[in-house]
A protein has these predicted regions:
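Surface-exposed, low-hydrophobicity beta-strand/loop segments enriched in small/polar/acidic residues
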Residues: 1-115
Length: 115
């Protein structure tokens, strides 16, 4: 046997060591997921690993179809500095998906198709 089908895979099980809020971006080595609900520390929850999400972004232009990366230390247009943001810069960041639409540098989010 080479493989056994488990499930569709839109979400994965996740048990955080500290509490996670709905909408938080979570990186597990090279896999980016987004919490769809609050998850208490040490409690089983799930992360979306596919779908389309509005993600806080760095102040930059991102073109539809561009690869989008998660910068864990990024400064979002409308969020807390250093709390993380989506970016088109690959260096030192984790691939999360592709931009669905053009994003202006002044937009607070980029619409991302998770991959």
């Amino acid at each position: 046997m080479q493989a056994t089908y488990i499930k569709v895979g839109r979400e994965i099980d996740y048990t955080p060591s500290s509490a996670v809020s709905a909408g938080d971006v979570v990186v597990q080595v090279n896999l980016v997921g987004i919490a769809t609900e609050d998850i208490a520390a040490s409690a089983l929850g799930s992360l979306a690993v596919s779908g389309i999400f509005d993600v806080d972004q760095n102040a930059e232009i991102i073109v539809a179809g561009d690869a989008v990366y998660w910068d864990a230390d990024g400064n979002s247009v409308s969020g807390t500095a250093g709390a993380g943001a989506a970016t088109a810069t690959a260096t030192d960041n984790t691939f999360m998906g592709y931009a669905q639409a053009l994003t202006a540098a002044t937009d607070s989010y980029v619409r991302v198709v998770l991959r």
